[in-house]
Amino acid sequence: MGYSMAKNVRQKMDSDATLYINDINASACEKFKSEFSSHGPIEIVSTAREASENSKVVISIVPGAVDVKKVYLDEKDGVIAGKPDEERVLCECSTIDVKSTREVGEALKAKGMGTYVDTPVSVSSIRCACNLILISS
């Protein structure tokens, strides 16, 4: 799901803007960059921290709450380890429990990392192909 979403984001972004991508599957990042760099710059980064420090908008989608906490709250490589930016928007698209969502959002707010938005999505391969993603917030 993340691959198709990233494809749509890269295709719709300003062609001068850089899309920073990260995935535990490095070959997926390389494939994505190869396929879509004609739409604009794509940088593969090794951590969520690196991605967020270079971005005003962060969109993440991972399998579960443990993964969300790692992306955002890991003290070395997570978003929270980076430089604060009150204007940054952090859209977390995974479907996770309310307690975890609040925990992550409160921790990020306390550190001035930006606005955390719980944005679970309803998407399928067909919807992605049609550029349709339903966002619940």
Task: Tell where the protein language model's regions lie, with residue ranges.
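Short, conserved loop/helix-junction motifs that constitute active-site signature segments
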Residues: 75-86
